Amino acid sequence: MSKRDYYEVLGVAKTASESELKVAFRKLAMVHHPDRNPGDKEAEIKFKEVNEAYQCLSDGQKRAAYDRFGHAAFSQGGAGGPGFGNEFGDFMSDIFENFFGDGRAAPGGGAGRGRGGAPGRERGSDLRYNLEISLEEAFAGKTETIRIPTSIACETCSGTGAKAGSKPRTCSTCGGYGRVRAAQGFFAIERTCPNCHGRGEVVDDPCTACSGAGRVNRERTLSINVPAGVDDGLRIRLAGEGESGMRGGTAGDLYVFLSIKPHPFFQRDGADLFCRVPISMVTAALSGEITVPVIDGSQTQVRIPAGTQTGKQFRIKSKGMPVLRSREVGDLYIQVSVETPQNLTKRQRELLQEFDQSASDENHPESAGFFSKVRDFFVSGATRA
C-alpha cells in the first residue's frame, strides 16, 4: 500500500515553515492520540502516520531528501527512514503534559522530568486575601497591614522534611525523576511515581517539627500599598508572597482582591462621582446657593439658577476620583431634587393658594404643555371615532 504524501498528512503546503509544521503536528497529534481514542485502531494508525510525517519534515536534511526523491529516499539503501529519538520524546512529553495532565503518553522511552525545573521541586500555592476599603481610602490611597495564615519553609530542616543529621534519599523507583513510564507497544505511558508521589526523594527519618512535610503553618504580617484611584474588584498581585515552595520550589503569589464599601453620599462611575442633593422649592424657584460635600472632605458651593427642576445636573470639574496611575481626575456631578414642603401651617397653605390663583401657564410651562398635549390627544381621538 503506497504511503500518503507527508505534506498532505499534516495538511500543510510544501513551503510550510518549521513553526507551521509544529502547529499542524500538535493539532493532529492531540486529535488522534490513543488516550483520547481508546480501542480505536484507525486513530492509532493515523497517529503513527502523523508522527512519521512530522519526524521527516521537521528535520532539514530528511525534508530535503524527501522533497527530491519522495518516499523512495527512505527505502532500503536510501537516507534512512524517520525515527523517534530522545528529542522527539521530550517534545511529545511537553505536548501531552499540557494536554493530558498527570498521565501522559509519548512515543519512545526515557525518564520523566518535572515541569518546574529539577525533579521533586514543587511551587507553593497562590493565596487570596479579600480587602474592603472605604471610598475615601480609594480616593487617597493607603498602606494596609494584613495578617494572613500561610505555610512557610520549616526552619528546623530548611524545608527538606528530613530530621537533623539526615537527608532525603533519591527515590529508587523513579531514579529521582518523580515519574515512571511503562511501555505499552508503540507508546510509553508516563505517570507520577507511586513511591515518592512525584517528589523524586524519599524521607526515611522525618523532621519532628514539620512531620516531614518541609513546611509549617504560620501567620504572616504584610504591608500592602493601595494606590489612589483603585476601583471595586481590582486585583493586586504580590509575587512570591504566597505559600512557600516544597523541596526548593518557588513560592506562590498573594492576590489581594479589593472591594469598596457603599458610600452614604456618592455613587461612582469610573473616575466620576455622583451626588443627589435635595433643595427647597423656594431655592429652586428663586435661585440661590447650596453647599455640597466633596470626596476629599471639603465642601464647595453650587449656584442654583431660578426655575431649576428636579433632575437638573451640575458638573464640578476635577472633584471626582483620581484615575489610577495617572494625573487625571474625574468630575463630581450634583443632581438636585426639589423637595415639596410638608406639614404646612394654615398661613403657609393660604400663601400657596394665593400663589396658585395668581400663577399662569408661563409659571408652569411643562405642566401646561403636558396637559395641553393630553387634551389634544383625546380630542383628536374622539374626532376620529
Swiss-Prot record:
Which keywords does this Swiss-Prot/TrEMBL entry list?
Answer: Chaperone, Cytoplasm, DNA replication, Metal-binding, Repeat, Stress response, Zinc, Zinc-finger
Domain named J: which ranges?
Answer: 5-70
How, per the record, is the cofactor bound? Answer: Binds 2 Zn(2+) ions per monomer.
Residue ranges of the CXXCXGXG motif repeats are 154-161, 171-178, 193-200, 207-214
Where exactly are the zinc fingers annotated as CR-type?
Answer: 141-219
- Which positions does UniProt annotate for Zn(2+) 2 binding? 171, 174, 193, 196
The protein's name is Chaperone protein DnaJ
Native organism: Methylorubrum extorquens (strain CM4 / NCIMB 13688) (Methylobacterium extorquens)
